[in-house]
Amino acid sequence: MNTNTLLLENKKAKFNYFIEEKVSCGIVLKGTEVKSIKAKKLSFNNSFASIKKEEFWLENLHVSKYKEGNIFNHDELRPRKLLIKKQELQRLKKFKEKEGYTLIPISFYLKKSIIKVEVGICKGKKLYDKREILKQKSIKKDLSREIKYK
C-alpha cells in the first residue's frame, strides 16, 4: 500500500526545466499553513529553494491565508525551512554551485499525515526545447485523433 498522497504538483516546473534528480525533504510549517496546504491553497509561481548558512530554505512559495484563521494567521510569502540530512545538503550545495542548476519545488505530498516537499535539481530549458516538446505533443494528439476516428 502506498502511503504517499499527492497534494499539489508543480506542472510548470516539468515544462520549464529538465529535472535531473528529485530529493524528498520535510518542511517547517505553522498550523494555519498546514490547513491551507491540505486545502490546496498554494502557488508555486517563482518559488525556489536556497541554501543559507548551512540551512535549506524554500523561498517565494505563496501559501494563502487560512480563511478560518484569526490574528495568528501566517505570512503568505515567508521563507520556510526545509528539513534534510547534512550529507544531502552538501550534495545539493555542489549542484547549486554548478552553473545553470537551480533547486525548484516539484510537489507537496502527505507521508503518514506529515507534509513533505519534493525538490528537484533542475536545469533551465531553452525556448527551442520547449517548442520541440509542444510540437511532439501536438503530433501525438493528431495521431490519436486520426486513430480514434478511423
UniProtKB/Swiss-Prot annotation:
Transmembrane segments: none annotated. Required for rescue of stalled ribosomes mediated by trans-translation. Binds to transfer-messenger RNA (tmRNA), required for stable association of tmRNA with ribosomes. tmRNA and SmpB together mimic tRNA shape, replacing the anticodon stem-loop with SmpB. tmRNA is encoded by the ssrA gene; the 2 termini fold to resemble tRNA(Ala) and it encodes a 'tag peptide', a short internal open reading frame. During trans-translation Ala-aminoacylated tmRNA acts like a tRNA, entering the A-site of stalled ribosomes, displacing the stalled mRNA. NCBIfam families: PRK05422.1, smpB. The keyword Ligase does not apply. GO terms for molecular function: RNA binding. Keywords: Cytoplasm, RNA-binding. This is SsrA-binding protein. GO terms for cellular component: cytosol. Belongs to the SmpB family. GO terms for biological process: trans-translation. It comes from Borrelia garinii subsp. bavariensis (strain ATCC BAA-2496 / DSM 23469 / PBi). InterPro entries: SmpB, SsrA-bd_prot, SsrA-bd_prot_CS. It holds the Pfam family SmpB. The gene is smpB. It is found in: Cytoplasm. Gene3D superfamilies: 2.40.280.10.
